[in-house]
Amino acid sequence: MKKTLLCLTLAGLLSACGGSDNDSGSNQNPPPSNQTIENYGTFLNSSVDNVSYETSSGISGTLTEENKTFKYQSGDKVQFSISGVQIGGLVTAQDNISPADLFTDETAQKNLLSFIDALDSDPDTDGVQISDEILEKLKNIPSITFDQPFENFSTQISETNLLNDQVLVSPDEIVIKQQQVFYKDIAGTWQSHENNSVAVIHILTNGNYILGQASPKDAESEAGIELGSLQWNPLNNSFEPTITHDTNGTAGLSHASDDKPYTLSSDGTYLILHEPGANSTYKLTRVKQSSGLVGTWKFSETQLFAFFDNNYYFFLDGIGGDDCGWAGIEYGKYSITSNTLAVTEVLYDTNECAGFHDTSDSAKVNATYSISGTSLTLHPQGEDTFTLQRSN
């Protein structure tokens, strides 16, 4: 992936993403080398309440529903525990701790996920809520051996009477379950920014995604669309996407540097993409939503409009038109006057006649619109009305 994944710096348009320069992960004025930098990380890509941590620099605390991240200084090691029961050993502190960071053995990694899953006292809510009853029981358990066959691990947990009659989810099933939970958590529309490029990615609850890239053409990449499936691995946060359509060259998620898989995690605010081959980290933010036009609207799961709050829009078209056009993107400016939407400038258009602009005659849409609940109805001049549904 070239370092063009992602959103609005064109013409100084960072506010279109509802973000700021700080979201790019770069710092034009780094602090002095002797200044202590405090970082924040997440534990297992989930909001797990009552996980305690202590770092080698002396920082300690407990993760809660309100405070989902742990603090650490660069170069720190960190130890995690729940009611005194250690979870793995002392590991390098970083922006996300995966099972593979805590245990080298895959069996132990899966056992850990099954264990954390079983501790959840309210599976119907987001995150993992550990009841006071279980926390008290854990205080009487000196240690738990994760590095053992699942059958033995399950027996050990059963003998502690920690979970009463609850059965642990099997190793294969827990991987699928954690994938589903993660996809649900990150589903929606995200953006970031890098140099003079703009891109938007919409992720579905099954892990499929559509990514649009608007950037100047170079020898390796160009504006275009990418569709695929993340294929995320909950054991180490890595993913090697299956690409089904790609017109943006090396931009997007299709070309990981040095063929080293990406990793993907979330802290509840940012979607954090790391590219090991380039030693680069990108933090994406959700597209701002509102009760008005600003936000994401869908015609289908792979045809979506994102309207930003400074009068820019982005159209993701993963299908194309029946009579003209093909899958692609459209990015431009719009104005609103008395419930009339007018496209004023088109900066990129790779899907020909679909969307708000027709490249064959440079015609731009001028349409009245109305919003009712979660529906947006547009009536372009001289055309039939069409309705979009609000997306997250």
Regions found by a protein language model. Give the residues of each.
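Contiguous, well-ordered beta-strand patches that form the walls/edges
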Residues: 194-198, 213-278, 300-303, 317-386
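Short, solvent-exposed mixed-charge patches
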Residues: 390-392
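C-terminal motif of bacterial Sec signal peptides marking the signal peptidase cleavage site
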Residues: 15-16
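A glycine-anchored, Pro-Gly-centered beta-turn/N-cap motif
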Residues: 188-189, 295-296, 332
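Structural signal for glycine-centered tight turns and loop->strand junctions in beta-sheet-rich domains
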Residues: 76, 205-209, 236-237, 268, ...
